[in-house]
Structures are given as structure tokens and as C-alpha cells.
Curated annotation (Swiss-Prot):
Gene3D superfamilies in alphabetical order: Jelly Rolls
Species of provenance: Aspergillus clavatus (strain ATCC 1007 / CBS 513.65 / DSM 816 / NCTC 3887 / NRRL 1 / QM 1276 / 107)
The gene coding this protein: bna1-2
Primary location: cytoplasm
Positions of O2 binding: R48
The protein, known as: 3-hydroxyanthranilate 3,4-dioxygenase 2
Amino acid sequence: MNPMPLSPLFFATWLAENEDQLRPPVNNYCLYQGNDFILMAVGGPNERNDYHVNETEVCLQPSWCSREANEQEWFYQVKGDMLLRVVENNAFRDIPIKEGEMFLLPGNTPHNPVRFKDTIGLVMERQRPAGSRDRLRWYCTKGDHASPTIIREEVFHCSDLGTQLKPIIEQWQQDEDGRRCAECSCIADPK
């Protein structure tokens, strides 16, 4: 784990020196990993179409949280705009997050962060406690389904988001037969 820095980090300087660290398919770099939370810089464009489900996020600032949800994942868009695709109330929904805006995503919400070219954001998540499970889901977007239909789901304990997601996403991208929807037989796009 990274120790707490002894001096402030000037993010613009860090970014100028490290932007090459933000590479596909996930495009993230861990800026800080403490006992309670992880702070990541994330760049665009990313090359993924999975929906991440994080069951561990707990809101520490109740005034920011909706009454319906006390679990959160924090997004702050530093440069450019992004799109956060979610599955909410058994339907797909797109949430634009513009430059300078922040958004708190309820925990256990399937979400796909779509990051465009030359965009930068910060994402904060809680550390995963022992026994917690993250999920990567891929949904069929080609068939005529009444509700979101999962093609594939990978369940794992996440200890390092930057290294664990990449091989799972790459396996999805390379396995055409594994991208076939069992209900409609359509093959999902790799990215």
C-alpha cells in the first residue's frame, strides 16, 4: 500500500509526467491505496463494454447520498466529459458527467464508464474487505430483450483493480463464442 504523501500532489504536474500510465482497456492508475479507500486517475479513451458491480462502497458523507442508497463510488471529471452507463430499475440508463462535475454512484449498481479521447477523471472506491465480491458483466445489446440480459458474468475478489480487470476484459474481447447471447444467439461486440 502507498503511504500517505507528506506533501500535496499537484495533479496537473503528475498527469503531465504520467499520462502514459492511463492505457486501455481500463486506463487507470492508482494514485493512493490506503486502509479505507483507493483513489485512481482514469483516462480516455477506454476499450471496454463490461458493467462493473462493486458491492463494497459505503457513503461516508450521508448528506451526499440519496435516501435509497448508502453505498457509493465517487467519480470526478477533471478534463472533458464522460458517460456512465448503468443498469437501474432493470433498464439501461446513460448518465453524462461533464468536466468539473462529480457523481456518487450507489453501490451494487452495474456501471460501464465510457471515457472519450483526451479525458481525465478521478475515481474513489473503498478497499474491498475479505469476502467481498466484484463482478464484471456483459449484457446483450443486440437482441430484442424486454430487460437487460446478461451474456457473461465474472465474479472475483478485487485486490488490484488495475491488474485484475485487464485479463478478464481481454479474454472477453478474444472469445467470440463466449460473447454469444444464450437467448437470442447474437454475438456481442468485443469492445
